[in-house]
């Protein structure tokens, strides 16, 4: 893990220097924009440099359908403000998203054409769909799309994608900057960059900003628009550190689901009708213990952790149950390989928290949390079926292009030989 080093310049100056260096070195540049406070400040800073240089940059906003109306209004305002200097990519296409508030629909698809009558809102005019991107396959995951977008937009040139994450937000985001695994995967040794595919780099210009820095920037630049939903969050008493925007049903994002019916009741009613489990999720997500699987959990009287795990599995829909059983088998097999002939009922909590020991209690906690990909067991989310479809289509296109190129060269050689023969005659 990298060591934090302090410098004698402020974070605003440092961010501007990173942006200048990026513009100096990359031929193609795009901004991944969400409408949140961090990406808004980052976009203002990037556009400041783009306008100064007279360069156009692409702005990618992936619309998840389930968004605050205030966020959509802010996106409109930002796109209009910088319309002369951006290439807009407001993307509304079916994407598979996590739904952590129910076992009956553990994933939902935004902009699902089969559920058009239940859409939370209509697509905005001029938005882009899967038809605008040759790599797009309906049902792709968000994380897969953004990587492929960078590769497609770069067209083989050196490309930078500005990402507005901050290390303060989570350990995962801190590791995106500080981990030693980035060795050889940065641009020019800059730890605020990450190589994601060939000749495409993520750039994190505000990674060292604190939440207070974000709002200090807006206080000093009142002419720069910000998302008005944060003003409503302040009025609702939400702490600055807990003010997050994203699709509302994810494993972490669901904690803010209750805010919708307070801040935007008109949007809330549509969310409840659109996504399974939205209402119950908002009611219980602030609870602890067995209701959500957070903090200390207990087993029913007369049950072991193993029998409680099996009881929880039996209450689930077959498809969801089969998914967890397959994941648990992988978990148990992995620990068998490390010398555990049997899985203990429980282990010291500090070892369980660090994933250093297996236990049936850990499996129960995964089920109670609706941890669909079993990240609490040290497992990761696999590539989606849509991504596999894209890979097959890409390989088929490349093979066809290679075949056509071979045929073209073959015809050129034949014509050349014919021309030479006629010249001799």
Feature roles, as predicted:
Residues 1-32, 37-425:
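Nucleotide-activated chemistry modules centered on ATP-dependent adenylation/adenylyltransferase
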């Amino acid at each position: 893990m990298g060591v934090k080093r302090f410098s004698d310049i402020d974070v605003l100056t440092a961010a501007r220097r990173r942006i200048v260096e990026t513009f100096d070195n990359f031929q193609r540049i795009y901004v991944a924009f969400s409408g949140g406070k961090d990406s808004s400040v980052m976009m203002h800073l990037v556009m400041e440099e783009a306008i100064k240089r007279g360069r156009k940059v692409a702005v990618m906003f992936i619309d998840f359908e389930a968004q605050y109306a205030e966020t959509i209004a802010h996106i409109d305002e930002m796109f209009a403000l910088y319309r002369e200097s951006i290439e807009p990519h407001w993307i509304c296409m079916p994407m598979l998203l996590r739904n952590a508030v129910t076992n009956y629909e553990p994933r939902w698809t935004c902009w699902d054409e089969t559920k058009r009558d239940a859409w939370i809102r209509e697509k905005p005019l001029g938005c882009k769909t899967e038809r605008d991107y040759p790599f797009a396959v309906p049902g792709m995951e968000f994380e897969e799309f953004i990587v492929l977008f960078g590769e497609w937009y770069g067209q083989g040139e050196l490309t930078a994608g500005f990402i507005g994450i901050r290390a303060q937000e989570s350990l995962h985001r801190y590791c995106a900057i500080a981990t030693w695994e980035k060795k050889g995967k940065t641009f020019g040794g800059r730890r605020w960059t990450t190589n994601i595919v060939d000749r495409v780099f993520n750039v994190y210009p505000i990674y060292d900003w604190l939440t207070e820095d974000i709002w200090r920037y807006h206080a000093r630049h009142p002419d720069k628009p910000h998302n008005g939903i944060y003003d409503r969050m302040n009025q609702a008493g939400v702490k600055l550190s807990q003010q997050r925007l994203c699709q509302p049903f994810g494993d972490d994002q669901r904690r803010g689901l209750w805010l919708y019916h307070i801040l935007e009741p008109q949007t809330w009613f549509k969310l409840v009708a659109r996504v399974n489990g939205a209402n119950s999720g908002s009611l219980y997500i602030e609870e602890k213990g067995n209701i959500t699987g957070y903090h200390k959990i207990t087993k029913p009287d007369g049950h072991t952790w193993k029998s409680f795990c099996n009881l929880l599995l039996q209450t689930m829909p077959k498809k969801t149950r089969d998914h967890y059983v397959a994941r648990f088998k992988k978990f148990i097999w992995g620990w068998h390989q490390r010398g555990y002939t049997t899985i203990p009922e429980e282990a010291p909590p500090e070892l369980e928290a660090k994933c250093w020991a297996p236990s049936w209690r850990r499996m129960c906690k995964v089920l109670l949390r609706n941890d669909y990909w079993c990240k609490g067991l040290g497992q990761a989310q696999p590539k989606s079926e849509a991504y596999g479809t894209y890979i097959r289509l890409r390989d088929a296109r490349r093979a066809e292009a290679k075949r056509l190129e071979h045929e073209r060269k073959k015809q050129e050689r034949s014509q050349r030989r014919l021309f030479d023969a006629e010249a001799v005659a």
